[in-house]
Amino acid sequence: MPAYRSRTSTHGRNMAGARSLWRATGMKNEDFGKPIIAVVNSFTQFVPGHVHLKDLGQLVAREIEKAGGIAKEFNTIAIDDGIAMGHDGMLYSLPSRELIADSVEYMVNGHCADAMVCISNCDKITPGMLMASLRLNIPSVFVSGGPMEAGKVVLSTGARKVDLIDAMVSAADDSMSDADVAVMEENACPTCGSCSGMFTANSMNCLTEALGLSLPGNGSVLATHADRQRLFVEAGHLIVDITRRYYEQNDDSVLPRNVASFAAFENAMSLDIAMGGSTNTVLHLLAAAQEGEVNFTMTDIDRLSRRVPCLCKVAPSVATVHMEDVHRAGGIMSILGQLDAAGLLNGDTKTVHATSLRAAIDRWDISRTNSDSVRQFYLAAPGGVPSQTAFSQSQRWDSLDTDRENGVIRSKAHAFSQDGGLAVLFGNIALDGCIVKTAGVDDSILKFSGPAVVYESQDDAVNGILTGKVKEGDVVVIRYEGPRGGPGMQEMLYPTSYLKSKGLGKACALITDGRFSGGTSGLSIGHCSPEAAEGGTIGLVETGDMIDIDIPNRGINLRVSDAVLAERRKAMEAKGKDAWKPVAPRKRKISSALKAYALFASSAAKGAVRVLKD
């Protein structure tokens, strides 16, 4: 039977000094035999998804103590990708994921904590904490801050729901008046919480439900709704229960690596494909799998993408549907329920809260359960009042969305498409693969061919789009923006948003070794691997080269002969130390911290995790 890790610092005469320090934090004699639970918070006033978390760590801590544990809270950093977007701040976003994972490891191992509750929300925080959980492999429960309410505006063209992406696109749309743009800006993000569509943050919080590491509703109940408080209260009691099961009953089924197994990663990816989640989730799931020593790869994602249909379309894929609508339709448990009914789910996987994922679905899927409390839970609605306070409203929908033919969540027979919402493409321009969010691609451009317009930075691409250098039918190529080449693998939200604002959203394609925001839609292909800085073919593309994209057949190819590519590669490598770098120096200050990340960063095909030599 495993010994409590915390006893390393709380038991024995030689630990008198450590116990003295523990006492200075408030511990008493009777506390030294109790499990020490780390409450890993991520409160910051910089990020709307985290601005309301300040008191929630202590809410969880009090519940842990009621259940018989000792709670010790600390915070990680948290970067807001939307605020960091469009300037060099975005270089720090993906590397911050590794810092978050490391900081959790440092704190938890440095103080010998027995278990942890992870309070995350936004883009890199949930993945960073997930990586730490699988790295440490101690009992863990995830509870996020919850989604933001969608904005609501009345413009000169009428009333509509809006989100952050709408505000960004409108600002670049010359046909919109300054007054309408101001209305969009002031109303797109009305409350605390992670941005209201199926962007990266919400996608990742939904996936923790499929992995079995969070409670039902974690991905969908609004940050402002009173019902979300129950998740934090239950998390405090649940973590003490599973901690005792592991340390006192030798039940290792509750450990993250046994919960988030290969089959669970298949479930999470199947959910992502079915709900048209952010392409960034691919990057983060691959990284988390590596931390958990799970052999889950791009090949597995490609296999799943060919069999899982698209059952749910949410903003940015459909402008009128947001997370509040997904919740009304039964949330993640109902999407998983439809996958299970279609034979596309591993229902026997473990969870921290139920005997199996299928048992959880039976209880929480509104299509299966007769529970009034469950149905009431999924009636939680937006309050419609701007607020930065958690649990500040208790509005309810009049009815649930149980329509599986034409509703927000659909059955396999009535899927938006039998082809899933994400796809992996392979070809000579991406030998190790690249990712496209097919849920956001118009059917008319699932097959697309056009001449390349090559840019060696996001800034140059934005300038080219805004000054009319990109024309209908072009394939915009943005390279040297990968994990090493950026460094930091910037999101390309501005280029895709500006293509939409110029009316080119359905008339152009974009390929990059960088990545995309969860708010991206259109024929936007990212994570091109190997990246240009690694010697990938994308570094050999020249303006005017024809590129063929074939999503139905999962192909992406540069229409250039192998012989010509070999000549270009030879010429590139002849540049010596200047090979596989932008032709012209970029106005980009790369700090020593970013250089350290670039030195060890792996390919996007491996999750862009750091790879250290033995």
Swiss-Prot record:
Self-association and partners: Homodimer.
Cofactor(s) the record lists: [2Fe-2S] cluster; Mg(2+)
Pathway recorded for this protein: Amino-acid biosynthesis; L-isoleucine biosynthesis; L-isoleucine from 2-oxobutanoate: step 3/4; Amino-acid biosynthesis; L-valine biosynthesis; L-valine from pyruvate: step 3/4
Source species, domain of life: Bacteria
Native source species: Rhodopseudomonas palustris (strain BisA53)
Catalysed reactions listed for this entry: (2R)-2,3-dihydroxy-3-methylbutanoate = 3-methyl-2-oxobutanoate + H2O; (2R,3R)-2,3-dihydroxy-3-methylpentanoate = (S)-3-methyl-2-oxopentanoate + H2O
Recorded GO CC terms: cytosol
Protein name: Dihydroxy-acid dehydratase
One Pfam family named in its UniProt record: ILV_EDD_C
Molecular function as annotated in GO: 2 iron, 2 sulfur cluster binding; dihydroxy-acid dehydratase activity; magnesium ion binding
Modified residues (N6-carboxylysine): K124
Enzyme class (EC, first level): lyase
Similarity comment: family membership: Belongs to the IlvD/Edd family.
Entry binding sites for [2Fe-2S] cluster: C122, C195
Active site: S517
Single Gene Ontology BP annotation: isoleucine biosynthetic process
Record-listed E.C. numbers: 4.2.1.9
Annotated binding of Mg(2+), by residue: D81, D123, K124, E491
InterPro entries for the chain: Dihydro-acid_dehy_C, DihydroxyA_deHydtase, DiOHA_6PGluconate_deHydtase_CS, ILV_EDD_C, ILV_EDD_N, IlvD/EDD_N
PANTHER family: D-XYLONATE DEHYDRATASE, D-XYLONATE DEHYDRATASE YAGF-RELATED
Alphabetic keyword roster: 2Fe-2S, Amino-acid biosynthesis, Branched-chain amino acid biosynthesis, Iron, Iron-sulfur, Lyase, Magnesium, Metal-binding
Cofactor note: Binds 1 [2Fe-2S] cluster per subunit. This cluster acts as a Lewis acid cofactor.
HAMAP family to which the protein is assigned, alphabetical: IlvD
NCBIfam families recorded: ilvD, PRK12448.1
Gene expressing this chain: ilvD
Record function comment: Functions in the biosynthesis of branched-chain amino acids. Catalyzes the dehydration of (2R,3R)-2,3-dihydroxy-3-methylpentanoate (2,3-dihydroxy-3-methylvalerate) into 2-oxo-3-methylpentanoate (2-oxo-3-methylvalerate) and of (2R)-2,3-dihydroxy-3-methylbutanoate (2,3-dihydroxyisovalerate) into 2-oxo-3-methylbutanoate (2-oxoisovalerate), the penultimate precursor to L-isoleucine and L-valine, respectively.
Listed Gene3D superfamilies: IlvD/EDD C-terminal domain-like (3.50.30.80)
